Amino acid sequence: MLARIIMSLLGWKVHKKLPAGVDRCVMIASPHTSNWDFVFTRSAFSILNIPVRFTIKDTWFKFPLNLIFGPLGGIAINRKPRKEGEERPSTVEAMAALFEKNKNLVVLVTPEGTRSYREEWKSGFYHVAKMANVPICLGYVDYKNKVAGVGMTVYPSDDIAADMKIIMRFYKDIAPKHPEKFSVDKRYI
């Protein structure tokens, strides 16, 4: 209800749902240049009844912040780089394991990894999807057209470059809030 009010008052529209039969995926949220991106994408996914979850550093998931992040869909994981010989999963392995534990799971990822400009995206989202054998759904927030939602779905193949080119073609024309802070991954255009 609150999501509909926010989107309506601010003149935003919501576009598309998850494809039929997709109840487990890695959902990219891009462009990510402003804190408002979270408000619009989270509102859109709420309206579309997509129960998105997101991973957050376990150090942030302590009282009282866990009372905020938990209800918003946060899942605590250890994101510290694994040291040689350390017996714990990498971040990618930990995220992929979430799909083994949860029948219906949509994990939201911001592939730029920051709200600042960067020419290369982080590829962990791709490796998580590949390892978990789930598709990558392309969530977006387009400030020019005031629309947020889900675009196409990419099923990871054995050719990351070809798959990433498809993803970059989709995002290259999506208008961010701060264009000077956004770039598709230059390696794949």
Stretch-by-stretch model annotation:
Residues M1-L2:
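Helix-enriched interaction subdomains in cytosolic or periplasmic regions
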Residues P176-I189:
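Charged, glycine-interspersed solvent-exposed loop segments at helix/strand-loop junctions
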